[in-house]
Structures are given as C-alpha cells and as structure tokens.
C-alpha cells in the first residue's frame, strides 16, 4: 500500500494536470508520475467518458482553492517532520561534541590553543534546545528559499502558482527580514556572536546524519514542486563517482612515479658498475705487460721444461726482483677494489628480478678430453660476450614492458548493476530476474496458501462428519435405553389397561342417535 505522502502528491499531480487543462497550458506541465498522463489519455470508451465528464465539471476557483490547500498541507507536513528530526539530531551531535571536548578543554587551557566550550557558550544567552532549533531552521529555510526561487523562475507569468508556493510556515520568515528566524539574522545575531559557534556549526554540517536529512528534505521539496528528482540523484551519484575515480588516479600516478624513480636509480647504478669494471680491466692489462717484460728470460715453452733447458739472464738481480714491494699501479688497483667493495656494501641490497625459470638438466655429467676443455673455455668467452648483450637487450625489454599501460581492474557487481539501471532502467537483466523471482515467490506463496485452505476445509468437513456420527449414536443409545426401561417394567398398570380398553370400545361403537324435528 502506498503511504499517505505519496497519495497526496499523486493527488496534487492530478489537480495540477486539471488546472493546466483548463488554462490550456498542458505543454508546459511535466507530471511527476507517468500514471497521471495515462489516466487522462486512456483508450477505453467507458474510461474516456468518465474523464470527459470529470474535466467538463471542473471550475478554476475550486481548483485554485484545492491546490492552495494541498501545497500548504504538504509543505507544512514536511517542514514539521524534518524540523523535529533534524533538531533532535543536531542536539545529539552537540552533546557528543561537548563530551569529546570536555577532556580537550583542559589540554587546550594548558597549551593555550582554541577549543569549543559549549557550557560557556550557552551559559548566558541560549539553551541547548534553542540553539539546535536555530541551526535547523537556518538550514531548512535556506533550502526552501532556494527551491522557491527556482520554481518562481519557471512560473514567471502565472500569479496563482506563486501564491501557492508562499502558503507555508517558513514563507513569513523568508519575506520578513526583521524576524529572528530569518537566516541572515540567525547568522549575524546568533552564530557569529556566540563564541566558537561558527566552528560548531561547521562540525555539525560535516556529520553524515545531518547531511542525509538535509538532502532528503531538499529532494522531498523538489518532488512537491515538480522538479526532476531522478536527474538530481544521478548528478549527485556522478559527482561521487568522479571524486572516487580522481582519488584512484592520484594514487596510481604516485605509484608509477615511485616505480620510475626506482628504475632510474637501478640503471644509473648499473652504468657506474660497468664503468668501474672497464677501468679495472685496463689497469690489469697494463700491469701484465710490464711483468712480462721483466720476466722474459724466465719464460719458456712446455717442451723446454720437459728437457730441462731453462736459462737465467745474467743482467738481472733476481733477489732484488723478488724482494721488491708492490708497484704503485698494483696498490692503486687494490685501493680501487677496496673502494668498490665498500661502496657496494654501503648501498642497500635489492632483490634481483628472476628473468626465467629454466628447467633442470635431464642428462648426466661427462668430463671429456683436454681438447674439449679448451674448446669449452673458448665457447665460454664467446658466451660471456653474448650474455652481456643479452642483459642490455633484457634491460630495454623491461623498460618497454614497464611503459605498457596497466590493465584496469574490473568494476564490482554493484557498480555494474547501477550503470545498467541507468542505461536500461526497468528492462535491465538483473532487474528482470529479480521481478521474475518475485513473481515465482508469489505463485509459490499462493499455492501454499491454497493448500493450507484446502487442508483446513477438509479438516472441518471431517470434524462435522464425526460430530454428526456422534449425535446419531447418542440418539440410538437414548432410544435403546427407553425400550429397555419399558421392557424391564413388565405388566402395565390396571388403570392404563382399563383406559386402553375404553378407547377401543369407543372406536368400535356404532352411532345410535335420534333425529329431532323442530316445528
């Protein structure tokens, strides 16, 4: 069953349709519910006749009065409902803030930092209920004033509609700028004058309960004034989605920048290590040439060693050569090696990425000959060069892979369903499935209900049959008892016998009357 508010709004929609029909301005009118247009543009003959009768019997004066009353009732009901609920909510929020700040006030006094002391705020001028009412009316009157302005812009030529809008409890406060409930007076004389009341008002406005109540009040007034509520809801939902997407993109950008910085640091370190290794190789090759020149006389072929034909150089003092200290070049090499090792130790260790998971060898080990070992060493040198090339290529490939756009995560089921509802409305597949489920549940409930009713009827019939049998049994029992009693008495009383015989004689007696003649 629809609620009272929805029924009254539907009635208002019908009254407005009738008014625009009489004023011949149906093109401007946009009905709140699709039922109103269907009702007044029906196809059946009987319904058409009824509606024609209804429209012909209408009068502008009566319609104006009805519209005025319905607008004022609806607006006043909404105002009263939301004022009571919002004032309670704001009062609770103020009490929560006062409890939280009671412990913070002492710390603030020590640190000399500003804090909200609600007891001092309300000690002189207002009570807590009055402050809550001021804050609620400040919010609700502002919302209603904005929507009245928006509606009056739509209806610039129609004076009757403007009078309908101003018939509510808050219209007097909006028009009368001297009243204490005017939002500008509330701001200037209450919120700004009380100490730290602006901060309190902002904190209350941030609470979700207050925001939800104000939004629902705004939407209900928009529905009364005939605005497109679904479009407003879609706008709010879109704004929330945009903020969520913006936060996601911001976090993704930060993640990408961090990855890029890490990659640049790794590349720079690898280049530095490569340069150091090249310099070390050059120094070692120079030192080897010098040593070969010094020990030319001592070197010989493998064949000479076997024959024992080695010779000594008379010009060289071998004791001096062996007792020499290491040269400057070699010391420089050691220093450079030590520095390189220290620098490597000081740098933070990073996990090397595993490029491939290679399969294990299936064959056994075979040593081979000396010639094969030499060929293997040559091959290793060749492969080492190839490996260097491969690492550079792998590095470029990794960079290209990192530049590829990352795959976006799929949206959740609820988000996708909301999008489908916006696109297809009631014809979305999940909506259709839900409707089918509801219909099946209804059918199942109907079947179960019918089965229960049939059971009850069968039970009642069986009870009635058993009761009728019991009655018949009782009757037969009573009759049998009477017969038994008469049989048990034996012979009848003589008076009864005499009476019975007299009756029998009377029945058998003949008529012996005389005819009497009158002169």
UniProtKB/Swiss-Prot annotation:
Q: Which GO terms describe its cellular component?
A: 90S preribosome; nucleolus; nucleus
Q: Which residues carry this modification: Phosphoserine?
A: 367, 375
Q: Where in the cell is it found?
A: Nucleus
Fetch the InterPro entries from UniProt: Bud22/SRFB1, Bud22_dom
- UniProt keyword Phosphoprotein present: yes
Coiled coil located at which positions?
A: 426-470
Q: Which residues carry this modification: Phosphothreonine?
A: 257, 371
Write down the Pfam families for this protein, in alphabetical order. BUD22
- Function, please? Involved in positioning the proximal bud pole signal.
Question: In which family does this protein belong, per the annotation?
Answer: Belongs to the BUD22 family.
Q: Any other noteworthy remark?
A: Present with 3250 molecules/cell in log phase SD medium.
Instruction: Give the protein's recorded name.
Output: Bud site selection protein 22
């Amino acid at each position: 069953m629809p609620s009272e508010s929805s029924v009254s709004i539907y009635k208002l929609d019908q009254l407005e349709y009738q008014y625009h029909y009489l004023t011949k301005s149906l093109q401007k009118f946009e009905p709140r519910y699709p039922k109103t247009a269907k009702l007044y543009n029906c196809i059946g003959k009987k319904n058409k006749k009824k509606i024609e009768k209804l429209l012909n019997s209408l009068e502008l004066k009566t319609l104006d009065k009805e519209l005025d009353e319905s607008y004022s009732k609806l607006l006043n009901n909404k105002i009263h409902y939301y004022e009571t609920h919002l004032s309670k909510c704001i009062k609770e929020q103020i009490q929560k803030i006062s409890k939280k700040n009671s412990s913070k006030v002492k710390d603030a006094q020590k640190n000399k930092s500003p804090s909200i002391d609600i007891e001092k705020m309300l000690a002189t001028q207002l009570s807590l209920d009055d402050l809550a009412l001021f804050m609620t009316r400040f919010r609700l009157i502002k919302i209603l004033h904005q929507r009245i302005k928006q509606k009056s812009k739509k209806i610039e030529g129609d004076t009757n509609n403007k009078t309908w809008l101003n018939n509510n409890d808050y219209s007097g406060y909006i028009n009368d700028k001297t009243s204490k409930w005017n939002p500008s007076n509330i701001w200037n004389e209450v919120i700004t004058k009380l100490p730290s009341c602006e901060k309190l008002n902002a904190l209350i406005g941030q609470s979700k309960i207050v925001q939800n109540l104000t939004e629902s009040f705004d939407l209900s007034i928009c529905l009364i004034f005939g605005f497109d509520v679904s479009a407003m809801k879609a706008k709010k939902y879109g704004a929330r989605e945009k903020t969520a997407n913006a936060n996601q993109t911001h976090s993704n950008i930060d993640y990408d920048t961090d990855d890029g910085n890490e990659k640049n640091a790794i590349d720079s370190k690898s280049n530095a290590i490569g340069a150091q290794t090249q310099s070390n190789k050059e120094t070692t090759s120079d030192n080897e040439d010098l040593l070969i020149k010094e020990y030319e006389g001592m070197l010989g072929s493998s064949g000479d060693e076997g024959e024992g034909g080695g010779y000594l150089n008379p010009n060289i003092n071998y004791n001096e050569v062996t007792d020499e200290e290491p040269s400057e070049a070699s010391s420089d090499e050691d220093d450079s090696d030590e520095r390189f090792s220290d620098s490597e130790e000081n740098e933070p260790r990073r996990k090397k990425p595993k490029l491939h998971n290679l399969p294990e060898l299936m064959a056994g080990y075979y040593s081979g000959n000396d010639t094969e070992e030499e060929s293997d060493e040559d091959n290793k040198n060749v492969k080492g060069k190839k490996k260097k090339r491969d690492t550079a290529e792998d590095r470029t490939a990794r960079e290209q892979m990192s530049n590829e756009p990352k795959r976006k995560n799929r949206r959740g089921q609820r988000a996708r369903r909301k999008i489908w509802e916006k696109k297809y409305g009631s014809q979305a597949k999940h909506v259709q499935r839900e409707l089918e489920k509801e219909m099946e549940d209804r059918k199942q409930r109907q079947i179960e209900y019918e089965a229960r009713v049939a059971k009850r009827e069968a039970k009642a019939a069986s009870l009635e049959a058993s009761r009728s049998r019991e009655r018949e049994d009782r009757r037969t029992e009573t009759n049998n008892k009477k017969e038994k009693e008469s049989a048990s008495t034996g012979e009848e009383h003589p008076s009864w016998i005499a009476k019975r015989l007299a009756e029998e004689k009377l029945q058998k007696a003949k008529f012996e009357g005389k005819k009497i003649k009158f002169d």
